UniProtKB/Swiss-Prot annotation:
It comes from Anopheles gambiae. This is Short form salivary protein D7R5. Disulfide bonds join C26-C58, C39-C166, C98-C117. The keyword Disulfide bond applies. Keywords: Disulfide bond, Secreted, Signal. It is found in: Secreted. Belongs to the PBP/GOBP family. Transmembrane segments: none annotated. One of its GO terms (cellular component) is extracellular space. In contrast to the related D7 salivary proteins, does not bind biogenic amines such as serotonin, noradrenaline, histamine and adrenaline. It is hypothesized that either D7r5 evolved an as yet unknown function or is becoming a pseudogene.
Length: 166
Protein backbone atom coordinates (compact mmCIF):
# COMPACT_ATOMS: atom_id res chain seq x y z
CA UNK A 1 0.00 0.00 0.00
CA UNK A 2 2.83 2.42 0.85
CA UNK A 3 4.41 2.10 -2.61
CA UNK A 4 1.21 3.50 -4.16
CA UNK A 5 1.58 6.69 -2.16
CA UNK A 6 5.16 6.98 -3.36
CA UNK A 7 4.03 6.59 -6.99
CA UNK A 8 1.33 9.25 -6.56
CA UNK A 9 3.79 11.66 -4.94
CA UNK A 10 6.38 10.97 -7.65
CA UNK A 11 3.81 11.79 -10.32
CA UNK A 12 2.44 14.92 -8.63
CA UNK A 13 5.70 16.60 -7.58
CA UNK A 14 6.90 17.40 -11.13
CA UNK A 15 3.51 18.97 -11.83
CA UNK A 16 3.85 21.23 -8.80
CA UNK A 17 7.32 22.28 -9.90
CA UNK A 18 6.11 23.12 -13.42
CA UNK A 19 3.27 25.25 -12.05
CA UNK A 20 5.60 27.32 -9.89
CA UNK A 21 8.06 28.02 -12.70
CA UNK A 22 8.67 31.73 -13.15
CA UNK A 23 9.92 33.50 -16.26
CA UNK A 24 13.11 34.45 -14.42
CA UNK A 25 13.75 30.71 -13.97
CA UNK A 26 13.57 30.32 -17.75
CA UNK A 27 16.27 32.98 -18.13
CA UNK A 28 18.50 31.33 -15.52
CA UNK A 29 18.28 27.96 -17.29
CA UNK A 30 19.65 29.36 -20.56
CA UNK A 31 23.34 29.04 -21.30
CA UNK A 32 25.42 32.20 -21.22
CA UNK A 33 26.01 31.85 -24.97
CA UNK A 34 22.25 32.09 -25.55
CA UNK A 35 21.78 35.18 -23.34
CA UNK A 36 21.58 37.53 -26.36
CA UNK A 37 18.87 35.35 -27.89
CA UNK A 38 16.84 35.51 -24.68
CA UNK A 39 17.28 39.28 -24.49
CA UNK A 40 16.19 39.64 -28.12
CA UNK A 41 13.02 37.67 -27.37
CA UNK A 42 12.39 39.75 -24.23
CA UNK A 43 12.70 42.90 -26.36
CA UNK A 44 10.13 41.41 -28.80
CA UNK A 45 12.60 41.04 -31.64
CA UNK A 46 11.53 38.08 -33.76
CA UNK A 47 14.24 35.50 -33.16
CA UNK A 48 14.46 32.01 -34.60
CA UNK A 49 16.40 28.97 -33.55
CA UNK A 50 16.40 26.17 -31.01
CA UNK A 51 17.46 28.39 -28.07
CA UNK A 52 14.78 30.96 -28.88
CA UNK A 53 12.11 28.25 -29.21
CA UNK A 54 13.21 26.66 -25.94
CA UNK A 55 13.09 29.98 -24.07
CA UNK A 56 9.73 31.01 -25.59
CA UNK A 57 8.26 27.60 -24.72
CA UNK A 58 9.49 27.94 -21.15
CA UNK A 59 8.19 31.46 -20.56
CA UNK A 60 4.88 30.85 -22.34
CA UNK A 61 4.40 27.84 -20.06
CA UNK A 62 5.39 29.87 -16.99
CA UNK A 63 2.82 32.51 -17.95
CA UNK A 64 0.13 29.89 -18.46
CA UNK A 65 -0.10 30.70 -22.18
CA UNK A 66 1.09 27.23 -23.23
CA UNK A 67 1.21 23.77 -21.74
CA UNK A 68 4.30 21.57 -21.46
CA UNK A 69 3.61 20.01 -24.87
CA UNK A 70 3.65 23.41 -26.57
CA UNK A 71 -0.10 23.70 -27.08
CA UNK A 72 -1.30 27.28 -26.73
CA UNK A 73 -3.89 27.86 -24.02
CA UNK A 74 -6.27 30.10 -25.96
CA UNK A 75 -8.51 31.03 -23.03
CA UNK A 76 -5.53 32.08 -20.88
CA UNK A 77 -4.13 34.24 -23.68
CA UNK A 78 -7.53 35.86 -24.24
CA UNK A 79 -7.99 36.49 -20.52
CA UNK A 80 -4.59 38.20 -20.38
CA UNK A 81 -5.48 40.30 -23.42
CA UNK A 82 -8.80 41.24 -21.81
CA UNK A 83 -6.85 42.64 -18.86
CA UNK A 84 -4.97 45.14 -21.05
CA UNK A 85 -7.48 45.96 -23.80
CA UNK A 86 -10.56 48.12 -23.38
CA UNK A 87 -12.16 47.11 -26.70
CA UNK A 88 -13.33 43.61 -25.87
CA UNK A 89 -12.52 40.96 -28.45
CA UNK A 90 -10.62 43.09 -30.98
CA UNK A 91 -7.66 40.70 -30.81
CA UNK A 92 -9.57 37.39 -30.96
CA UNK A 93 -9.11 37.04 -34.73
CA UNK A 94 -5.34 37.53 -34.41
CA UNK A 95 -5.14 34.91 -31.65
CA UNK A 96 -7.15 32.44 -33.73
CA UNK A 97 -5.05 32.98 -36.88
CA UNK A 98 -1.80 32.54 -34.95
CA UNK A 99 -3.19 29.56 -33.07
CA UNK A 100 -4.15 27.91 -36.35
CA UNK A 101 -0.62 28.36 -37.72
CA UNK A 102 1.01 27.10 -34.52
CA UNK A 103 -1.16 23.96 -34.32
CA UNK A 104 0.36 22.67 -37.56
CA UNK A 105 3.88 22.60 -36.10
CA UNK A 106 5.66 20.17 -33.78
CA UNK A 107 5.18 20.93 -30.07
CA UNK A 108 8.67 22.36 -29.67
CA UNK A 109 7.95 25.06 -32.26
CA UNK A 110 4.35 25.99 -31.42
CA UNK A 111 4.98 28.59 -28.72
CA UNK A 112 7.67 30.34 -30.75
CA UNK A 113 5.49 30.37 -33.84
CA UNK A 114 2.49 31.73 -31.93
CA UNK A 115 4.63 34.37 -30.19
CA UNK A 116 6.22 35.54 -33.46
CA UNK A 117 2.89 35.53 -35.27
CA UNK A 118 1.22 37.67 -32.59
CA UNK A 119 4.05 40.20 -32.89
CA UNK A 120 3.20 40.61 -36.59
CA UNK A 121 -0.51 41.32 -36.06
CA UNK A 122 -2.46 44.51 -35.44
CA UNK A 123 -2.74 43.29 -31.84
CA UNK A 124 1.05 43.20 -31.31
CA UNK A 125 1.11 46.01 -28.72
CA UNK A 126 -1.78 44.47 -26.79
CA UNK A 127 -0.01 41.11 -26.84
CA UNK A 128 3.22 42.68 -25.52
CA UNK A 129 1.23 44.40 -22.78
CA UNK A 130 -0.52 41.13 -21.89
CA UNK A 131 2.78 39.21 -21.76
CA UNK A 132 4.39 41.83 -19.53
CA UNK A 133 1.44 42.20 -17.18
CA UNK A 134 1.13 38.43 -16.87
CA UNK A 135 4.86 38.11 -16.15
CA UNK A 136 4.55 40.66 -13.35
CA UNK A 137 1.48 38.88 -11.96
CA UNK A 138 3.14 35.46 -12.04
CA UNK A 139 6.16 36.94 -10.25
CA UNK A 140 3.79 38.46 -7.64
CA UNK A 141 5.01 41.95 -8.51
CA UNK A 142 1.58 43.19 -9.64
CA UNK A 143 -1.46 43.05 -7.35
CA UNK A 144 -4.14 40.86 -8.92
CA UNK A 145 -6.92 43.44 -8.60
CA UNK A 146 -4.92 46.42 -9.84
CA UNK A 147 -5.93 47.83 -13.22
CA UNK A 148 -3.50 47.80 -16.12
CA UNK A 149 -1.29 50.89 -16.39
CA UNK A 150 1.03 50.67 -19.42
CA UNK A 151 3.60 53.19 -18.18
CA UNK A 152 3.86 51.49 -14.79
CA UNK A 153 4.14 48.03 -16.37
CA UNK A 154 6.82 49.24 -18.79
CA UNK A 155 8.82 50.81 -15.96
CA UNK A 156 8.65 47.63 -13.91
CA UNK A 157 9.64 45.53 -16.93
CA UNK A 158 12.66 47.76 -17.63
CA UNK A 159 13.77 47.18 -14.04
CA UNK A 160 13.17 43.44 -14.33
CA UNK A 161 15.04 43.21 -17.65
CA UNK A 162 17.92 45.15 -16.13
CA UNK A 163 18.09 42.64 -13.26
CA UNK A 164 18.12 39.84 -15.84
CA UNK A 165 20.90 41.66 -17.74
CA UNK A 166 18.78 42.30 -20.83
Amino acid sequence: MEWRYFVVIALICPLIIVETLAVSDCVRHVSESARNTVCDVRQYRVTKGVEADRYVQCFMTALGFADESGSIQRSNVLTALDAVETHDGVYTDAVDVCLSKAKKLPGTERSGSFFSCMLRTESAQNFRDAVELQELRVASKWPEGERFDRSKVQLMMRELNSQLRC
